[in-house]
């Protein structure tokens, strides 16, 4: 499976998360996943909620349109973005 998959109602992203980074950013390809650095620590779901908020801003969608499908408790996650309004250039470059 690719790091970014386009389907009828949006995008599915396979992510590798780096918590406690110095700033929030989409780093780029990391193996067969997209690496995303976030400032939140991996404690009590803070990293997940911060990731959802960050991706919501990047794709210009509501937080309810960012769904963690797999990997709630790990660094490797599968995220679905429903009907993105914009696609960040780092992600657009990975779409086949």
Curated annotation (Swiss-Prot):
Question: Source taxonomy lineage?
Answer: Bacteria, Pseudomonadati, Pseudomonadota, Gammaproteobacteria, Enterobacterales
* An example Gene Ontology CC term for this record: cytoplasm
**Which family is this sequence assigned to?**
Belongs to the UPF0235 family.
This chain belongs to the protein called UPF0235 protein YggU
Under InterPro entries, the record lists: DUF167, YggU-like_sf
> Source species, please?
Escherichia coli (strain K12)
- Give one Pfam hit by family name: DUF167
HAMAP family per record: UPF0235
